[in-house]
Amino acid sequence: VTPQVLDILDEYGWKATFFCVGDNVRKYPEVYQEVLRRGHRVGNHSFNHIRGYRYSVEDYVANVQKASTYIESCLFRPPHGRITFSQIKALKADYDIVMWDVITFDYDKKKKPKQIMRTVRNYLRKGSIVVFHDSIKAKENVLTVLPQALAYWKEKGYSYGLL
């Protein structure tokens, strides 16, 4: 899915920050390199996309550090937005922890493209961080909605900024 997302972003002249799962980068290093080659930024999204609250601080940090052997970035986004204060404290010396304010739920098979686009239109504000997913679960929705969202943002005069 990532190569198709990259093509859509290129078509509209936009850059994005991709928060990568370390195990995916390990399995598909050529896709990771292509993201960088096309001028996008990357962030760490853990090695196994784990839910923070289910892990000790030590195990969580170890998982993030394992991902950092494949992903060179000072940015970290906790999977599912789940992270404890103790985990934040342990990671903040090495990472800027980046959350979001607009989640598209593009991975939810029950969500239709129209609903996702409505979310994008209704909740976008100046400075918003919008989350799309370049995953198999999100494929149908992201490939439909991302071009619509980019066209809408251009029409409304929004611009992007890499994190």
Residues covered by each model-derived region:
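Structural preference for beta-strand elements that scaffold enzyme active sites
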Residues: 15-17, 39-43, 75-77, 96-97, ...
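His/Asp/Glu-enriched short active-site or ligand-binding loop at hydrolase and phosphoryl-transfer sites
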Residues: 74, 82-123, 157-163
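Acidic-and-aromatic substrate-binding clefts and catalytic sites of carbohydrate-active enzymes
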Residues: 19-28, 50-58, 77-84, 105-111, ...
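Charged helix-capping and loop-helix junction motifs
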Residues: 33, 57-64, 112-117, 143-147
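Anion (oxyanion) recognition and catalysis
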Residues: 10, 36, 91-92, 154
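Histidine-centered catalytic micro-motifs
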Residues: 42-48, 81, 131-134
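C-terminal domain-boundary segment and adjacent tail
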Residues: 7-16, 24-27, 140-163
